[in-house]
Regions:
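Gly/Pro-rich hinge or "lid" segments in bacterial periplasmic/extracellular proteins
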Residues: 53-104, 108, 118
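Sec-exported extracytoplasmic/periplasmic mature domains
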Residues: 14-21, 55, 98, 125, ...
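Aromatic- and charge-enriched surface segment that lines or borders ligand/interaction sites
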Residues: 1-20
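Ligand-binding "clamshell"
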Residues: 25-27, 141-152
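Extracytoplasmic
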Residues: 27, 36-38, 75-77, 88, ...
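Ligand-site clamp/hinge motif
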Residues: 2, 98-142
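A bilobed periplasmic-binding-protein/Venus flytrap-type ligand-binding module shared by bacterial periplasmic
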Residues: 94-97, 155-168
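Surface-exposed binding/hinge segments that line
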Residues: 22-64
């Protein structure tokens, strides 16, 4: 694949704010400077949540030269390559032979969309799936035991706030 340097990230973010109204409003990008692996972002105003916004799902860094396929697949920077996307059903991934961080120890992954909470719980219990996200609260007791590794957080997003009490 192509290198993911600051110029590639800059190009991706320029495209993002051009086509995504919310991203443009959130990020408040005035200008950017790319230098090797360092990207400097200048904003139109103070934007203390910039790092949080860059980690939003819309902020995924993709190869904009490759674009988005008709079925929604993009070229990214991760350890897997998408081979098939069927909206509201599944996403098939295979290991990226050119992954920058070396060998990927899983050959393929299928990410299934299971929107019904009971169906999701039953699929996990039966071994049909190996992991789940967005489990219904009512199902928690079933998985809070030694047979499962269960983690729960109140939100999928977190924010860091710092106050400067020395400045008015």
């Amino acid at each position: 694949g192509k290198p993911c340097d600051a110029e590639a990230v800059k190009k991706c973010l320029e495209d993002l704010v051009a086509v995504h109204e919310r991203a443009a409003g959130d990020l408040k990008i005035d200008s950017m400077e790319a230098d090797g692996l360092v990207l400097t972002i200048h904003t139109t105003e103070a934007c203390p949540s910039l790092m949080n916004y860059l980690s939003e799902p819309y902020g995924c860094i993709i190869d904009v030269d490759e674009g988005v396929t008709e079925d929604g697949i993009v070229v990214g920077t991760g350890p897997f390559v998408a081979t098939e996307l069927v909206t509201d059903d599944h996403l098939n991934l295979v290991k990226n032979e050119n992954y920058w961080d070396g060998n990927v120890n899983v050959d393929e992954i299928t990410v299934r969309t299971i929107s019904d909470g009971d169906t999701l719980a039953l699929a996990l219990q039966s071994g049909e799936i190996n992991a789940a996200y967005g489990m219904a609260y009512a199902s928690y007791p079933v998985f809070e035991n030694d047979n499962y590794q269960f983690t729960s957080v109140q939100t999928s997003r977190s924010f860091y706030v710092q106050m400067n009490y020395a400045s008015p």
